[in-house]
Amino acid sequence: MVGRATRVAGLALLLLATSCTSGSVSPSPSASGRPTGATHLQLIEAEDAQTLDPALIDDPTSLAIGNEIFAGLTRLDANQRPVPGLAERWEIGDAGRTYTFHLRNAHYQSGATVQAQDALSAWTRALAPQMNSPLTIFFSPLGARYPGDSITGVQAVDSTTLRVQLPQANSELLTLLALPPYWLIDPKQPTAGAGPYHLDKWERGRALQLSAYTGYWGSSPSVRKVDIEIEPDNTKRLDRFTSGGADIAHGFGGSQLLAFARDPQRAAELHRVPNTRATWLGFNTVAGSGYGPTDRMALAQAIDRARVTDLALFGSMLAVPATDLLPPGVPGHLARQLPGYDPAAAKTALDAASFPSRLDLYFSTNATVGRVATDLQDQISTATGRTVVLHPTGDFFNQAALDKLPFFIDTWSADIPYPSDILENVIRANSQFNNLRLFDPAIESALDQGRAATTWDDALKAYQQAEMVALSQNRLIPLYSGVEPYLVRSGLRVPFVGGAIAFHWEDVR
């Protein structure tokens, strides 16, 4: 998997945080003299939104802004659990294959009333070939995957009732409905959403201005105005924040953040928010069949996760040691008891098993994972007395294509804050991205149960069981979970959620 090996290309690399794009700055007033609470929020971003069309959004800045302008049938609460959005309630029937949504009385920013038919119109629009949407795969629960595919199981029963019939049960649907391309739009004015804020002005590459929508169906936001400045230069962006010109800033490199955190007067302004990125060591069941259970446990004991994130990830500024394959930014994460660091036990076990004197380690993606690979090469070599040969990124993909990838570092960044996004891709048999070539009937059964579950709790329990089976075999060894650092001015309370969307403007106090 290359960086963003999931269904929306490029997002993981953007989340890793350093932008090199050029652009100009829109001046914004100094923050001095502003009250400690927030009625006017000033944000500074490294990159502009690429689009604010719900059918096309596939970058983090567009997602964060679009989430404030538009709304779906559901929304995600502080635990990323789907709760009522434009649908005030719903029923699930036919063993999870039929959903009936009852819409609340809500209006778009154009003044038009939200109607059930609008959902079908918005989703059909996103699937239209001329839209060239990169998000059509998200409609797979509805039986559509590609541009031009039709949706046959969605029916507007009346103006406030929408019935969705799925080809097969899929518990991911309620989470998907809170994200693009499922957001509803006014069919006559596609730029008008039903979210808490509307766009007042957009100077491309410079700034955006938004204000609270007075007709919003939810609680009235205390933040009434939001200004977003675009500053690609990391140093200038940090200067804007430290001089009081911005309330919230992010998108910085690890070295900058490390220096910032070492300033005792500034450290409290740094917040590391869990995202959806997971990184692990894996053993291919075919090419890596020579690694037995004892060998895999020994290699797990040869790794100090805290050292990995400290040395390779700038003092854990960009990640934290993993306690699970599912990162904290994805529902279902558990603080599991993973094999602990014990280099002496690792060497003893490998020596007793007459383990070979050489290991070949492959890694995917980018420079960050490359630093991790270099540190793991040193750790494993020092702990076990073996020579660890580190192969370049190109070898990873060549060997993966030939199914000859024995021992490797892999990573996944989920588009959807739901366990299936990671587990269905990483440990489901025959998945394109299952570089483990793992097949276990117990895993398959648990994944099937998670997909077919009709309640949130039952789904998470099943997915956690599937993961437990994979981890108990040490076929994969979780290394670290990603975090997205944010700088927040003192006195401002930001209830960070994490996952795909770090926080909501309307929750800032």
PLM feature spans:
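Extracytoplasmic/peripheral linker and loop segments enriched in polar/acidic and small residues
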Residues: 154-155, 386-398, 422-490
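Periplasmic-binding protein-like
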Residues: 286-329, 371-372, 467-475
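Long beta-strand-rich cores associated with HINT superfamily self-processing modules
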Residues: 486-509
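Ligand-site clamp/hinge motif
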Residues: 214-259
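N-terminal lobe/hinge region of extracytoplasmic solute-binding protein
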Residues: 44-94, 124, 192-193
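Gly/Pro-rich hinge or "lid" segments in bacterial periplasmic/extracellular proteins
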Residues: 160, 166-221, 225-227, 235
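Structural transition elements
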Residues: 317-352, 366-371
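Surface-exposed binding/hinge segments that line
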Residues: 100, 118, 134-186
